[in-house]
């Protein structure tokens, strides 16, 4: 999962699109034989914690935010969630705890980054 995060960050450069982040994460994770949680995604960061664009960890053509061009000054949370088995998750009765449906292990790494003229800057 950490390597998937690093690959996503490498693709978070001026002129690329959200698609470039999402697709690079998905290609790496699936090539390693793992699956990607689809219900939870990264996001923009601004005056509120969760703003557009959404930063999915997969390249679903139906996600319009994939076409958003990355511009200098944007802050993004990139946060791949990778499962050893099925990609499906469930929320416990406490309304907060999330588990894989099949009981296999899952991992999540996250960084907040700033898109700069030269390379992404990790803020966390």
What are these regions (language model features)?
Residues 1-124:
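Active-site neighborhoods and metal-handling regions in enzymes and metal-associated proteins
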